[in-house]
Amino acid sequence: MQTPLKRTYEARFFLASLISLSSVILLTIPDAEALPSFSRQTGQNCSVCHTQSFGPNLTPFGRDFKLGGYTMGGGSGTAAKLPALSGMALGSLTNTQKDQTVQSLNEPNGTLPSGWKGNNNFTFDQASLFYAGRVYGKVGAFSELTFDGFANRLSMGNADIRFADRFDLDDTSLPFDLDFTYGISLNNNPTVQDLWNTTPVWGFPYTGSGVQPSVGATPLIDGALGSQVGGATAYTMINNLLYLEAGAYGSFSSSTQNSFGIAGPDRVNLNGAAPYWRVALQHDWKGHYFQLGHYGMIANVVPGRDSTFGTNNYTDVAVDATYQYMANLKHIFEAKTTYIYEDQNLSASRGAAGDPSTGNTYLGTYRLNLAYTFDQTYGLTFAYNQINGSHSPILNDVGAIVDQVRPNSKYYTAELVYVPFGKSNSYLYLTNLRTSLQYIGYSQANGTNTDAQFNNTFMVNGWLAF
């Protein structure tokens, strides 16, 4: 087991490599400004696409840029001619109300790996190198190579490669005036291609740490397939009103997963194609933006790539909604919510655990977050999460069932954000830094109210893009 000190040395080496690469880019740019690739390509500062000038949360303009396949131009000069490369680094300090247990001979089931402290851990959470922007013509990409400082692993992160174009029936002899933006997305994580910040990949919270307590459960569509599958979806936006998307995912081979840095007993293999769909309505009434949507996925999964006991079957269906007040960019108000219902038939996992029970189980996940942003610099977000589900078994070291537990959990997240750069009037307006204070408070954790507050977590996060 490698210690945090050794992990830190390796993380510094990876970060130094990123900075060295970025320095080559910086030295070729007037005034030596660090320019994220999307900003260089479009000539726009980060606040045009992002409500808080940094992070995944998109403005209507940012959603249009993604819908159009990351190919929009507008930049000029030396910066616009540079390769579409960017770097990113994240770190955090995490405190929990009660010390966590650390794995050892006496605590084999500790919640933290050996080498970490029970509390007040600093983690170099992530360092990433991106290719993000136009590839050629109407083809663009967002792709990520990531070093996970907690897991001490280099892997392929999120990837979304798109072809996109536009077609207007008004330009034809047909008696219709319909405008279509259409495209194809090749990606490796369901919902990574989504335009809205209600779906799992780009939903709040945008930062976290590997050392924070793991509470509740998540549906399959929420990260369980990331970088382990490849998918193709076709989409269209009609009259900037109706969005339609459909496609399917299949598993990468075991060797491909290994080459992407995905290994371990929690790997999954899809048995056949897994259909995915998305539909949404959106409209902007003079700065009041509304969206209402639905998305879902059906998958047959071979857990751990071991087909001895067959497959687990999942059907995930969700509804989501977004409101943004963007009429006055000094004061941005947002409300976002989603509910995901997962129907499960876990016959493979039951067979492996010797569980004789039959029938379907379920998992329900509700998320709501409210946000206020001042001057696209200072942000306050409050979020509420609730998880409900069927009983699931707890296994001992030899795989026997020793107890049953529900994943039921209730908690809130409060976050303060400061983003000093990314605006047209900012010093170094095309580089970016996001700092945040985050507190997570639990009233229920893993099916019990008793001692749920011991999981309460305070984090200080720093996030740099260059």
PLM-predicted stretches and their roles:
Residues 45, 414-420, 454-466:
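Outer-membrane beta-barrel "beta-signal"
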Residues 58-59, 89-96, 103-104, 116-254, ...:
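Outer membrane beta-barrel
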Residues 97-105, 153-158, 195-201, 255-266, ...:
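Outer-membrane beta-barrel translocator domains and adjoining extracellular loop/strand segments
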Residues 80-82, 120-124, 152-156, 223-227, ...:
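Transmembrane beta-barrel outer-membrane domains
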Residues 1-11:
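N-terminal secretory signal peptides that target proteins for export/translocation
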Residues 43-53:
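The canonical Cys-X-X-Cys-His
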Residues 21-31:
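C-terminal segment of classical bacterial N-terminal signal peptides
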Residues 287-420:
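Detector for outer-membrane/organellar transmembrane beta-barrel domains
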